[in-house]
UniProtKB/Swiss-Prot annotation:
Source taxonomy: Bacteria, Bacillati, Bacillota, Bacilli, Lactobacillales
Alphabetical UniProt keywords: Isomerase, tRNA processing
EC number(s) per entry: 5.4.99.12
Membrane spanning residue stretches: none
Subunit structure: Homodimer.
GO biological process per UniProt: tRNA pseudouridine synthesis
Binding of substrate, residues: Y111
Function: Formation of pseudouridine at positions 38, 39 and 40 in the anticodon stem and loop of transfer RNAs.
CDD domains registered for this protein in UniProt: PseudoU_synth_EcTruA (cd02570)
Protein's UniProt keywords contain Nucleus: no
Top EC class, one word: isomerase
Keyword Isomerase annotated: yes
HAMAP family from the UniProt entry: TruA
Protein name (Swiss-Prot/TrEMBL): tRNA pseudouridine synthase A
Length: 249
């Protein structure tokens, strides 16, 4: 068996998420179907570093899979890239160590979240940025977002129903900028892992702070209380991008 590691990007608009589901179109299923075709019917399972939800996009998702036969990496990348649907792109592909695991090898992820604050909104970007038409104090949000940096228990920012018991994560960087060309707000979060809907819940809380409906200290309050009810609403998935994954040596 030869293990392969690939970096892929995808437009999440028409996917029900990354992970295979019954009666739903997913990124995992489309890639596995293509690999099955390329290998003459072998059943191949891929493993992703991040499990993105419906409508969420990726610039730099990492996957791995095993093939019985050794293939030229660039030829395999080209075949996968050209035979998967147009909303999936295979950026790079290489042979990996036998013990490499896309999800469980220690890594840092970076997520980006785009918010269209235009009035009116840009209809061409409706699948790629979340629209927020209400007044916002950007400086307030830039001050509040700093409270997310560090090692915290993020229970108050995760969705109900998660099976993960340890909710302590480290965020190494959290920033908010405004794109000078589009005017969109760009929230960027880097860390050693993120809980289910954590990024979207953090963005939803920051937007409420920017709109004056929550105080600037609310981030600290949610972290200390671990109370989801004190956080803002979950921002829509269409503004979220899995930007980059970096593995430790």
């Amino acid at each position: 068996m030869t293990r392969y590691k690939a970096i892929i990007s995808y437009d999440g608009t028409l996917f029900s998420g990354f992970q295979r589901q019954s009666q739903a179109r997913t990124v995992q299923e489309e890639i596995e179907k293509t690999l099955q075709k390329l290998t003459g019917g072998q059943g191949i399972q891929i493993h992703g570093a991040g499990i993105t939800d419906a409508g969420v996009h990726a610039y730099g998702q990492v996957i791995h899979f095993d093939l019985e036969q050794k293939r030229d990496p660039e030829k395999l990348r080209f075949a996968l890239d050209t035979q998967t649907p147009d909303d999936i792109d295979v950026i790079s592909l290489e042979i990996a160590a036998d013990d490499f695991h896309a999800r469980y090898h220690k890594h840092f992820k970076t997520y980006e979240f785009l918010v269209d604050i235009g009035r009116p909104k840009n209809p061409m970007m409706r699948h790629y940025a979340t629209h927020y038409p209400y007044p916002l104090d950007i400086a307030k949000m830039q001050a509040a977002i700093k409270d997310l940096v560090g090692t915290h228990d993020f229970t108050g920012f995760t969705a109900a129903g998660t099976s993960v018991k340890n909710k302590v994560r480290t965020i190494t960087a959290a920033t908010l900028t405004q794109d000078p060309k589009t005017g969109f707000l760009v929230f960027t979060f880097s860390g050693n892992g993120f809980l289910y809907k954590q990024v979207r819940n953090m963005v939803g809380t920051l937007l409420k702070i920017g709109n004056g409906r929550l105080p600037i200290e609310q981030i600290r309050l949610v972290l200390e209380s671990k109370n989801r009810q004190l956080a803002g609403p979950t921002a829509a998935g269409n503004g979220l991008y899995l930007k980059e994954i970096i593995y430790e040596e």
